[in-house]
Design a protein with these regions (language model features):
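A short hydrophobic beta-strand segment most commonly corresponding to one strand
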Residues: 54, 81, 96-112
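Short acidic-glycine-tyrosine-enriched beta hairpin
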Residues: 68-85
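A short, N-terminal "cap"/entry segment at the start of jelly-roll beta-barrel domains
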Residues: 1-31, 115-124
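Short beta-strand His + acidic residue motifs that chelate non-heme Fe in jelly-roll/DSBH
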Residues: 45-46, 64-65, 82, 88-95
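Glycine- and acidic-residue-biased ligand/ion/polar-headgroup-sensing regions
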Residues: 50-62
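Conserved short histidine dyad/triad with adjacent acidic residue
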Residues: 34-49
Length: 124
């Protein structure tokens, strides 16, 4: 059995916020669970080429926007799932940070970070 608190896990600056990675590849669970903070007012061009991801909003507000401009509003109680390695923009409202519980499959190593200085969607 694995039991961990937020104070016991690694905190990674993923590029536009923080990610507390509760379960990673080394735990041999087959998935990652993270508590992800998205900085207020940030817009992140993201794509997970090797992972599927689902995010459940627990605090704050924001949007996830597809490359064709389709916009989905995020608020506590809303989940979105990237089931086709979708390129997308994750946007946090300027009023405050957005908090998500993120699940990745296959699991992350735990040290991954995004790079937003490229001309393409940041990926890992």
């Amino acid at each position: 059995m694995i039991v961990r608190s937020k104070t016991e896990v690694d905190c990674v600056d993923w590029g536009n916020g923080l990610s507390y990675r509760f379960l990673t590849q080394r735990d041999n669970m087959g998935f990652t669970v993270a508590h992800t903070l998205v900085k207020a007012g940030s817009k992140s061009p993201l794509q997970y080429r090797r992972h599927l991801e689902a995010c459940y909003c627990i605090a704050g507000r924001g949007q996830v926007v597809t490359t064709d401009g389709t916009t989905f509003n995020l608020s506590p109680g809303v989940i979105y799932a990237l089931d086709d390695h979708d390129e997308h923009f994750l946007i946090a409202c300027s009023e405050g940070d957005m908090e998500l519980i993120s699940v990745f499959s296959p699991p992350l190593r735990g040290d991954e970070r995004h790079s937003f200085d490229q001309a393409e969607f940041s990926h890992y």
